[in-house]
Curated annotation (Swiss-Prot):
Belongs to the alpha-carbonic anhydrase family. This is Carbonic anhydrase-related protein. One of its GO terms (cellular component) is cytoplasm. Gene3D superfamilies: Alpha carbonic anhydrase. Residues 16-28 have a biased composition (Acidic residues). PROSITE patterns: ALPHA_CA_1, ALPHA_CA_2. The gene is Ca8. It comes from Mus musculus (Mouse). GO terms for biological process: positive regulation of calcium-mediated signaling. The record marks 117 as: Ancestral zinc ligand. It holds the Pfam family Carb_anhydrase.
Length: 291
């Protein structure tokens, strides 16, 4: 299965009728530079129901039906997880079968946890992709799941209705997050794009801030990275995780380029501010599982 550079491999460039077109698009690079218009290359980025969004908590609609079937992450400890710097983010690829069900997800369907991705700012005043009442957090984690009941792979699920579910976790600065130490301790070894390292153990359960899993918002949106395909159910937890200043600084030492690469003028090569601007809500409704 491709890693969520699956974005840069199979999924970002769906099958075309013309092989030449497919070959041409596979070489397309994308980034977070100011003024970059993803929609010129990735048409889905021009969709009406894009992510991320600003979440206005006062306008969120309480939906008690979200609690009829409790949101149930059945996560298991992952052995030998691969952590990769893909030049856009840090990915933790999970090989153990962890699944998510219940809550806003279609009844009787399971969503398999594929990977964890990180978005962070160069400064603590920004970094999260979503904002709450226009407040940004220093970091946001995405737990990306695909519908393993309806589809055979994440590549098949992307862009399909009920294909992808993403848990978003805001991150604030405070005490050290013990569950993320396995990742932050090896970031110096994967400082450059294309570097990977296997960690012996990673427990995704440590990323869930609320043991009751009741305080969350839900809306329908898209991937926040190209191809920006829609059909994504977003579950955003109300209460943030906490990591230390030292831990987030480890992310800020990462680079967007391969070691020894010549940088273009005006680019310092630092990996950070890797968040997409918020997109219009349009006519979407944000639901809340709490009052």
């Amino acid at each position: 299965m491709a890693d969520l550079s699956f974005i840069e491999d199979a999924v970002a460039f769906p099958e075309k009728e013309e092989d030449e077109e497919e070959e041409e698009e596979e070489g397309v690079e994308w980034g977070y530079e100011e003024g970059v218009e993803w929609g010129l290359v990735f048409p889905d980025a021009n969709g009406e129901y894009q992510s991320p969004i600003n979440l206005n908590s006062r306008e969120a609609r309480y939906d008690p039906s979200l609690l009829d079937v409790r949101l149930s992450p059945n996560y298991v400890v992952c052995r030998d997880c691969e952590v990769t710097n893909d030049g856009h983010t840090i990915q933790v690829i999970l090989k153990s079968k962890s699944v998510l069900s219940g809550g806003p997800l279609p009844q009787g369907q399971e969503f398999e946890l594929y990977e964890v991705r990180f978005h962070w700012g160069r400064e603590n005043q920004r970094g999260s992709e979503h904002t709450v009442n226009f407040k940004a957090f220093p970091m946001e984690l995405h737990l990306i799941h695909w519908n393993s009941t309806l589809f055979g792979s994440i590549d098949e699920a992307v862009g399909k209705p009920h294909g992808i579910a993403i848990i978003a976790l805001f991150v604030q600065i405070g005490k050290e997050h013990v569950g993320l130490k396995a990742v932050t301790e090896i970031l110096q070894d994967i400082q450059y794009k294309g570097k990977s390292k296997t960690i012996p153990c990673f427990n995704p359960n440590t990323l869930l801030p609320d043991p009751l899993l009741r305080d969350y918002w839900v809306y329908e949106g898209s991937l926040t990275i190209p191809p920006c395909s829609e059909g994504v159910t977003w579950i955003l937890f109300r209460y943030p995780l906490t990591i230390s200043q030292m831990q987030i600084e480890e992310f800020r030492r990462l680079r967007t380029h391969v070691k020894g690469a010549e940088l273009v003028e005006g680019c310092d090569g630092i990996l950070g501010d890797n968040f997409r601007p918020t997109q219009p809500l349009s006519d979407r409704v944000i639901r809340a599982a709490f009052q």
